Amino acid sequence: MTKRVALLAGLDASALEHVYAERLRPNPGAENMIAGLQAHGIKIALVSGGFTYFTEKLKMRLGLDYARANTLEIIDGRLTGRVLGTIVGAEGKRAFLHELCQTLGISTQQAAAMGDGANDLLMMNAAGLSIAYHAKPAVRAQAHTALNHCSLDGVLALLGVSAA
């Protein structure tokens, strides 16, 4: 992560807005899934090995309850090529799950975690329910269940929750 971020040194921070506007799209069914889960009092968090610039915008746009990602250092409108704070990787995702469950006053066994890559596995293994979403084979093999051929709102049927 640090080597990849270092390549961004000197880039004008406005490039992040361009990436967000032109390339970032929620997965199909995201809005329906979020609305359906929240209508039943379920809290939604986005935890990503990506960057807070994007996750905070998605949090606001989609009405998510929580978000955690890596913070890019920006000085005088330019990326420095450094990440501030602890890097959110596999261990960071698991730690966030534990932290969030503590904040919500629930056990990790009462939480569900969904992911698609190897850096999601520690978090998914710590949750009471793990869902592989269009995931790599190794992730599907370790998850409690997998959604391979549907949109994100397939989670509603999986959990027996009606749409909002």
At which residue positions do the language-model features occur?
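Short, compositionally biased "basic patch" segments
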Residues: 1-9
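C-terminal cap/substrate-recognition subdomain and adjoining C-terminal extension
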Residues: 9-164
